[in-house]
């Protein structure tokens, strides 16, 4: 949500809405992952992944940082998929669904960034 506070300019309103939706969805993904971990007799971490502050706040910079975040999440879900493949259909399906969502978000951000090329 920090990024959404830093957006300025004529595209502010739709981009702020988009970034807030992404933040809410990230929280939902974390809660879902925690539920899966707890359901498998694990202990979900209370740590929050650090998001590096670059102090660059143009719309292009914010969207590029968001894209990097999505691509990082995509790689983590791909690693999860490779570790659970042929071991748990349930976790495979979960990982595949998350990969699909992250790919969709990445594509949306790439399209948004085309205006800044």
What spans do the regions from the language model cover?
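Iron-associated oxidoreductase/ferritin-like identity signal
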Residues: 1-117
């Amino acid at each position: 949500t920090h990024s959404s506070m830093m957006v300025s300019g004529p595209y502010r309103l739709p981009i702020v809405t988009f970034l807030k939706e992404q933040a809410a969805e990230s929280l939902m993904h974390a809660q879902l992952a925690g539920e899966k971990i707890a359901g498998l007799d694990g202990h979900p971490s209370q740590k929050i992944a650090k998001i590096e502050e670059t102090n660059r706040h143009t719309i292009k910079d914010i969207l590029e940082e968001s894209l990097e975040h999505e691509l990082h999440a995509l790689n983590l879900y791909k690693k999860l998929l490779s570790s659970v493949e042929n071991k748990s259909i349930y976790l495979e399906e979960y990982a595949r669904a998350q990969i699909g969502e992250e790919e969709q978000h990445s594509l949306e951000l790439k399209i948004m960034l085309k205006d800044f090329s």
